[in-house]
Amino acid sequence: MIPLRDDIPSNTFPIVNYILIAANLAVFAFELSLGRSLDQYIFTHAAIPVQVVSEGFTAGQFVKMTATMFFHGGWLHLLSNMLYLWIFGDNVEDRMGHFRFLVFYLLTGYLATFAHIFSFPESTIPLVGASGAIAGVLGAYLVLFPQARVLTLVFIFIFIQVIYIPALVFLGIWFVLQLLSGTA
C-alpha cells in the first residue's frame, strides 16, 4: 500500500513540514557525499543507546539524539518517511500551528529515541531515522482527523487498485507493519 493523498485540505501553507522534509533530504545528500567515511560519521554523530546510558543525558547526547532524527539508512527509509510526512504532516501542522507542530515533531522524535534506548540499553548500533517523529505525526493525525480517508495505491497480486481507505485502517496497517518489521 502506498498513500497518494488524503481527503483533508490544508488551510495554511505547511512551511515547517516542507522545511523538515528539505532538511531530511539535505542531510541524506550529505550522507551520500561521505562515501566510505559515512559509517564512521554516523557512529560519531548519531545516538547510540549504550553511550547514552553510560554517559547520561548530556548536551552532546542531546545533539546526537537530534541528529539521529535526520539520518536515514537508505533511499527507501528516507523516501517512505518523507512520503508519510508529506501526506499527513501538512494537516497536523495546519491544525496545531507552525511552532507547535515543530515542537511536537521533535518531542515525539525524542520520545521514540528514548523508548528505543530504554528498550535496548546495551545496543551499540547507532539510531537513524525520523520514524519515531513520523509515528507521532501519524498518531496526531488519527486523533485530529479520525474520519479522514487516504487515497491509496494497493497491490493485489498482479493487479493494482487505487482506492480510498479510512485513515484509521490505513494507519492501523502501517502501525502493525512497523511492529512486525521491528520484531523481525
Give the positions of each predicted feature:
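A detector for small-residue-rich transmembrane helices and their helix-helix packing motifs
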Residues: 1-184
